Amino acid sequence: MPKCDVKTRYIPATFAWIVLLLTTFLFFFYPCQFYVKSHPWVLAYQGVITFFVLANFTLATFMDPGIIPKASPDEDCEEELRAPLYKNAEINGITVKMKWCVTCKFYRPPRCSHCSVCNHCIETFDHHCPWVNNCIGRRNYRFFFFFLVSLSIHMLSIFSLCLVYVLKIMPNIKDTAPIVAIILMGLVTILAIPIFGLTGFHMVLVSRGRTTNEQVTGKFKGGYNPFSRGCWHNCCYTQFGPQYPSLLNPKKYASRRSQVQNQAISTICNDRSGQQTGAGSGAGGNGTAAVSGGGGGVGSGGGMRGTAVQYSPRSFYDASREKRGIQVKTYMAEGNGYNQRSGSTTLYSKLSPGRECSDTDLEPPPASQSQDCEPTPPLQRHNSSSFYLPQVSDSGGLNGSVSTGGGGGGDSPRHMRLYHPRHSPHARPRGLDPQRGYTSDALSPDHPVGYGVGVNGSQQQQQQALAAAAAAAAVAAQNQRSATTTATPTMQQRIKPLGVATPLVMASPVRRSNPGTPTQPRRPDFIGLNAQAVAQQQQQQQQAAAAAAAAYYEYTSGLPPQHPQAPSIQQQQQQLLLQQQRVLMQHQQQQQALQQQQQQQQQAAVHAAHPQHAALAQAAYGGSPQRRFLSEGELVRQGAGGGVAGGELSYARSNNTVDNIRELAGSPQRGVYMWKDTSPGFTNNAGQQQQQQQQAQQVVSSGIGSSAGTLSSSGAAAGVMPHAQYMTAGGGAHPLIMTHSRLQDYTIQQQQQQQQQQAAAAAAASYHRSNPTSPTTMPQVSGAGQSYILRYGGGGAVGAAGSSGSLASVTASNPATGGGGYQPALRGGVAVFPPNPMGNQGGGNLQTQPSPQIKRKQTPTRPMSFVRALEMADSMEMQSLEQQQNGGIPGSGSVGNNQQAGGGGGGHLMQSNASNSGTPDRASIYDMNYEISV
């Protein structure tokens, strides 16, 4: 409605009052005299109706309809950098828009609208009625509705009584009284259509729970009205619901609230200075005061760093009683026990304590509240003894001499980390501690004893020690206060599983990852095993087991989950594991002599056979430390099997590696990567495969490798082989990590098997990595038979996957068995196949087999994939490195060079399979049809 002049606004209302009063007076003065003597109840009845009409009309005209005062200048300044012009509020599951009022300078509540005539925002705005010269809103709608109902009854009564009066005195129709009665009947007839129509319209609106504004604008047309309570309840609530106080005069309510105003809403300003101002500062401990008056919001968290200014809530209110009409949003109170978090941002309270996702219009001024910070916790009320917040004292300079609660990095005592048994791969709730992700495997409760400590192992061990001390201090404080607190999920904990980059996540040194690039691949840092490191590591793992509960791994191991529990239980599990290893060692040593005899017999048979006839029987797939996720097949096979080789995936995978497909290719790889052989002699004979597997079980032996990479021990070279990056042990060892107590058992085996290495020279096969982006060199110990160094098994006479911890069965094909070729047991995923290796057949007899040719188009239209480009780049780079380590001499096919490369202790064990070609690896690279199973 257009804005009217002040003088013209009163004309309709004045006319309405004149008509109402005049008609009522004329009715009582003329027609009603006829009913006084004969029907006196008519006068009383009509008097009551008239009273309700005038009373409701007066209230509807002069009552505050629910005006929301305009924002004060202080509040207006606060909203200079406000959010967009719309905000959403959810009411009964329906999202309702809240518009920004440019005139009143605030977001209008639901069902609120700005009246252009009154120039005010009206709560539950219905319409502006010119006949009452007032808006009809939340506070006066019931009186307006009662006015319409009573006026309708009043009009009907006047019309009916005047009609009866005229019919009674028809002979005297020319008198004054009958003429007045006829005029009143005519006036009622003229006003009947609008009055009765308006009354009926509002009856419908009341029954539906709508307003005139909502009905006219069609907000809930054909949809659900979240404000409706049902027909009967709508009528009762409209007429008999609560009467809300007026907001135009808040001073009249100030005296009523004076008794409760002493309860302050405190603002906590944490700084990193680490100054403790004594018991007066509380456990928050920095004594920084921040007072935000009048909604202006002076945030002084960083500017007043290290000060000890304190304002009592009572004195603050006493000094600002004259400003009671101005909204004060944040105040400073004594310390409430809320401790400093590990984040560098400053925490402020919002309008309501404990709120997290508040609207932007209710936020403090800019730069006062970070969206990643945790909001103010529930605060301690004045003179309250039932609020259990432990006062944590200074713990000797921990975390910058700022008192911390449970958990390393400064967890709050109000948010104690709960140690729950975790059987799910999903992330557990954590606080804002820096080490909340990518914890080293050495500190994992699921990690078996004997794994090498990662790069950040020492740092994380220190953090674990600090975390244990802080947790003990927090538990002691909890016991003193005899209270029990539970951790509540915060906004940061909800954002973290979603992958939102927060300053704390990006600033954490543990979370940083530098994946390799095609031009600059990064080598993983491996640390070899020795006796001291293993012993020290086992002791540290047992001590830090209780504090390492926050470690989380996406790749679950096959062992039973070892969650934080009593150290005695973990020691029993470790002792049981060592006993099983010793039993297996004794059993394998007894079978060693028989195995060596069988190996010598089969070596002679393999020397006479072609290299492509060497059979590879795929054993239990063990995975790779360079993959972080289980495939579908691995999930199915995880709990299957028994015995030595049955426990598939019974190891803890290294999770913080940087050269994995997920980080480089950008997609989680969940398939099983396998090779295929298209060489001549590849058959699908099921009986032959069973024969090979039975033969493999007779000649099986296992290799023990470090957690650095995938190793393979084959043939007579299955002994301990020291390497620059690897330490391999074979010859009947259990496929677990070799500890220092068992190195002496392999000293004799090493000497015997080194002699066998010199006697039997193996073929040099091109290595193939399970992860094309990994630059890890796959050393191969030469044997009589050919071996494929794959991450799911080994080949030749003897093979093992060292880091996987699974026993790789190897079959040596004998011409007497009546078949050639090999048949790897494909167990899921996309089958991807390497070329058949070429090798030395005995003393100097180098038989070169051409790589199998995969049929391709003459002019391939598809460009080289990213994975293949990385594979080619890595192969060429590793070839140059191998040539440099061998003194610049490429693989010449001589037995001496092969023996030197196979038995050497320092260089990479990688032999060229194409001695007649200048580019030995390039030929096989183009034959690799490497694909990724997604």
Swiss-Prot record:
Reaction catalysis annotation: L-cysteinyl-[protein] + hexadecanoyl-CoA = S-hexadecanoyl-L-cysteinyl-[protein] + CoA
Ranges of compositional bias, category Polar residues: 337-349, 381-394, 768-780, 910-919
Residue stretches making up the DHHC domain: 99-149
Record topological domains on the Cytoplasmic side: 1-9, 69-142, 199-934
Extracellular side: 31-47, 164-177
Transmembrane feature ranges: 10-30, 48-68, 143-163, 178-198
Classification via PANTHER family: ANKYRIN REPEAT AND LEM DOMAIN-CONTAINING PROTEIN 2, PALMITOYLTRANSFERASE ZDHHC8
Function, in words: Palmitoyltransferase that catalyzes the addition of palmitate onto various protein substrates and therefore functions in several unrelated biological processes. Regulates tissue growth possibly by regulating Ras64B protein stability. May regulate CG34450 mRNA levels.
Domain comment quoted from the record: The DHHC domain is required for palmitoyltransferase activity.
Protein name per its UniProtKB record: Palmitoyltransferase ZDHHC8
UniProt source species: Drosophila melanogaster
